[in-house]
Amino acid sequence: MSIPNSPDYQLEQSIASLFSAVTGVNVYTTTRTGARTFPYIAISARPIRQLVTPYSGVYEMEVAVNYSDSSAKVSSSTFDTTYLDIFASLYGTGQSLQFEIQDNSTDIHVYMARISSQTPTIQIAKRAWNKGLVISAIVTPDPTGDGQAELDFSQYLNSQYLAVI
């Protein structure tokens, strides 16, 4: 589960806000607990690694965006049409994905974002259509967006001491 001020939480919230224009679909992030009702979009961000750069706090993130709907109630063509609406909302204003995410976020700076893969499947056991995509992003939790992470000296075990000394 993500911490509210962590880069993965902020990235999930920013991407979730992009889907507000898609009607009739529930949007869930990893911080949402409980049952999910069809149709839904599940968003899950996780850090892959911290990039070695002159500045500390730059992360490579992977965001899984999965769309699911009941195959008993929805035809495959309707499912695909809704998925295309979801896909189009990632590029709603005609900007690149990086700027779309950045425009909906205040606490992270997005250096790069791209769709790295898509996974179409149908789950027979649950009688659900499921289609997803993976977004790769490079972000820093810097609210000023100048590329330098803020140093917090309140904890003596802060790993950023090494970069400063």
What are these model-derived regions, one by one?
Residues M1-V25, R46-I165:
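Charged, amphipathic alpha-helical segments and their flanking helix caps
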Residues T37-P47:
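A short, hydrophobic beta-strand-centered structural micro-motif
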Residues V27-R36:
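Short acidic low-complexity segments
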